[in-house]
């Protein structure tokens, strides 16, 4: 089994800690989890190990790995496109600007020969890496090889005859048709190089997410289980150059799961015509790097469960933009709802293992955003403590924000509270709060006067012109659900706050950085 991915920053479903005036780092170390590897998880992951082994079997030697990294590199692809353009340009320039009674210059033929030899080497290296049978199973690869070999033979023959026999034969009368054919061949080869470049761009964008690379497909798409697919956005137009082309996704689903799939689009920011997928598309509007509402998670999991129960062949394909954060949140909820796993920790760990391809790098491709982790934990409680129903609604009022150990000048710090997609509180309003920076205790106190009633899913954002902005166009933010607040207190350390959890933000937010909210009830 592969090594576990990097530690999930998830502390469980209860955020509260014993009330203290100033938290210490030790109180907030709970995000470091031991990989929750169970026997059932080992069995489930092992089912995919054969598939993964087959995907990398052709790269089993160090030499093949090195060759594969070279021919699959972006620079190698760009260089290939440049050579095709150069070859076509030289050929056209020679036809247009050279006296028609002269022969094709030996210099041009030599350059053309060198270019042809480069592409012949490219084909041979790819055959070496992928294997002859696998490489030539693709019709485009067969055509590309023919396009390379035929002009190469023409160049070799022409150089030979140009020197020995054909010094008195004008080139136009005998070669114009052949040259036109060669131009068409070169252009077709350029289109094939563009296809290879698109593959490289898609792999660069998807990084080391596990891809489906069988049966002529190369998609940012992962079977999390046999019936749950996670993938990136099915794109068209310019975006299809570096993301999954929607036509290929449709072809894949129709070939593998015809009439037995449903697609879930979790993006609020982009969509496509549902007709592509035969109108079997459901859309849940979730903002990037944010969370679904708890109600949406319950409705989604019940709907998918019902769909799965209708036919054992039914599957779901779930995506957001990159097929990682929002997708992972909902997939983990589905794993818990279907009782494949019982805990949030197990489902989060498993999704990260399935989505990450460690043969390329160890970068974690699971659910990283703290609020998304938190909501998977909430859903686990909904499933097990509330019998898959929403918990009783609890109405709370914010009395005070306490921000610990923030660096820099944040005299213009502002807080905004969002509920049901509307701003219900903003500290910019006159008279609704007071802000005090206690330098001695290194705390910022924001006392809220007559705050609005809060219930269900709540988002809190902080703004300051002196702090760098990251996700959501703000320095830091987080989500919580009022039904899970205990003792009228929520305390979140750095690794449970969205944006400060990322290592690149740690120069601004020290380990002691935390946000605490004190609530009241009326």
Curated annotation (Swiss-Prot):
The keyword Cytoplasm applies. The keyword Lipid metabolism applies. The active site is at 320 (phosphocysteine intermediate). InterPro entries: C2_domain_sf, Dual-spec_lipid-protein_phosph, Ion_trans_dom, Prot-tyrosine_phosphatase-like, PTP-SAK, PTP_VSP_TPTE, Tensin_C2-dom, Tensin_phosphatase. Disulfide bonds: none annotated. Pfam families: Ion_trans, PTEN_C2, PTP-SAK. Isoform 3 is expressed in testis, brain and stomach while isoform 4 seems to be testis-specific. Residues 1-11 have a biased composition (Polar residues). Residues 12-27 have a biased composition (Basic and acidic residues). One of its GO terms (biological process) is phosphatidylinositol biosynthetic process. Its EC number is 3.1.3.67. It comes from the Eukaryota. Residues 1-28 are annotated as: Disordered. GO terms for cellular component: cytoplasm; cytosol; endoplasmic reticulum membrane; Golgi membrane. Residues 210-386 form the Phosphatase tensin-type domain. The chain crosses the membrane at residues 66-86, 111-131, 146-166. Acts as a lipid phosphatase, removing the phosphate in the D3 position of the inositol ring from phosphatidylinositol 3,4,5-trisphosphate. This is Phosphatidylinositol 3,4,5-trisphosphate 3-phosphatase TPTE2. The gene is TPTE2.
